[in-house]
């Protein structure tokens, strides 16, 4: 077959006592904005969600740089306004028909929950982004608008290789190699799919710790304190009324 299973990688947030790599998440946002945003939407993400790794002022300025649909004016005519924190991230296309027309009939998937929606999750996304350029197996026929990628189902994908070395410049100066950009945008998409990952993980540890304390306390009480009550016996002594 032409399909390959993505290799499992040591993502930090899968470790016991580590969370999301927030520097990587922020860099991944840069990759998304400059490479993937023109085609792929984030329909479940609002600008205020970016405050998880950006300042409120940065988020306000980012939202205001886009125009969104506003309520119609007194004449009923449509109008625009600068975006605000509570607005959904601006979508690249107005509707599905426009998206398909711009992509040779294919509908670019929304990336809001892509790591949850694809088998293999982050491993699949990273493998897909770095899987171009492999030798095409015999029997696989490609048109001029198709590419071979062993990690895509069927091996034939309509999306051209999205990443090339040094195609962007990171704000923090990190070298923008293909593996680096693939790793960063994958971390960003993992955050989009699971924005409360760290909070849920911390809550899980707190729950485990609380249950452990309750279990130890209950065991101690049962072993050393409740024995006093369990060893007591009630005896019925009838009252002697003759005295």
From Swiss-Prot:
Q: What is its main location?
A: mitochondrion
Broad enzyme group: translocase
Residues that span the membrane, as ranges: 202-221
Q: Which residues lie on this side of the membrane: Mitochondrial matrix?
A: 222-243
Tell me the compartments it is located in: Mitochondrion inner membrane
Which residues are on the Mitochondrial intermembrane side of the membrane? 1-201
Q: Which UniProt keywords apply?
A: Electron transport, Heme, Iron, Membrane, Metal-binding, Mitochondrion, Mitochondrion inner membrane, Respiratory chain, Translocase, Transmembrane, Transmembrane helix, Transport
InterPro entries according to UniProt: Cyt_c-like_dom_sf, Cyt_c1, Cyt_c1_TM_anchor_C
Q: Name the chemical reaction catalysed here.
A: a quinol + 2 Fe(III)-[cytochrome c](out) = a quinone + 2 Fe(II)-[cytochrome c](out) + 2 H(+)(out)
The entry's heme-binding residues are 39-40, 159
Membrane topology (UniProt):
Single-pass membrane protein
> Superkingdom of the source?
Eukaryota
Instruction: Name all Cytochrome c domain ranges.
Output: 5-194
Instruction: Tell me the Gene Ontology biological-process terms attached to this UniProt entry.
Output: mitochondrial electron transport, ubiquinol to cytochrome c
Remarks, anything else?
This cytochrome c1 is unusual, its alpha-band exists at 561 nm instead at 553 nm.
On subunit structure and binding partners, the annotation says:
Component of the ubiquinol-cytochrome c oxidoreductase (cytochrome b-c1 complex, complex III, CIII), a multisubunit enzyme composed of 3 respiratory subunits cytochrome b, cytochrome c1 and Rieske protein, 2 core protein subunits, and additional low-molecular weight protein subunits. The complex exists as an obligatory dimer and forms supercomplexes (SCs) in the inner mitochondrial membrane with cytochrome c oxidase (complex IV, CIV).
What exactly does this protein do?
Answer: Component of the ubiquinol-cytochrome c oxidoreductase, a multisubunit transmembrane complex that is part of the mitochondrial electron transport chain which drives oxidative phosphorylation.
Protein known as: Cytochrome c1, heme protein
Which species is this UniProt entry from?
Answer: Euglena gracilis
Q: Where is the organism placed in the taxonomic lineage, from the top?
A: Eukaryota, Discoba, Euglenozoa, Euglenida, Spirocuta
């Amino acid at each position: 077959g032409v399909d390959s299973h993505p290799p499992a990688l040591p993502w930090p947030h899968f470790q016991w006592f580590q969370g999301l790599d927030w520097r990587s998440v922020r860099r991944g946002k840069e990759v998304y904005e400059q490479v993937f945003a023109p085609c792929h939407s984030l329909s479940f993400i609002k600008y205020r969600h970016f405050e998880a790794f950006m300042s409120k002022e940065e988020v306000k300025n980012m939202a205001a740089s886009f125009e969104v649909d506003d309520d119609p004016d007194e004449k009923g005519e449509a109008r625009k306004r600068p975006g605000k924190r509570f607005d959904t991230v601006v979508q690249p296309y107005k509707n599905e028909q426009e998206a398909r027309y711009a992509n040779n009939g294919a509908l670019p998937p929304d990336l809001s929950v892509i790591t949850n929606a694809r088998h293999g999750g982050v491993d699949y996304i990273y493998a897909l982004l770095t899987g171009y350029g492999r030798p095409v197996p015999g029997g696989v026929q490609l048109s001029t608008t198709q590419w071979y990628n062993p990690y895509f189902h069927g091996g034939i994908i309509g999306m051209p290789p999205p990443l090339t070395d040094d195609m962007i410049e990171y704000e923090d100066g990190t070298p923008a190699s293909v593996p680096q950009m693939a790793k960063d945008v994958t971390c960003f998409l993992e955050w989009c799919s699971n924005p409360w990952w760290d909070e849920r993980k911390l809550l899980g540890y707190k729950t485990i710790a609380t249950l452990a304390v309750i279990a130890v306390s209950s065991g101690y009480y049962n072993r050393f304190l409740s024995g006093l009550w369990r060893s007591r016996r009630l005896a019925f002594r009838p009252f002697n009324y003759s005295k």
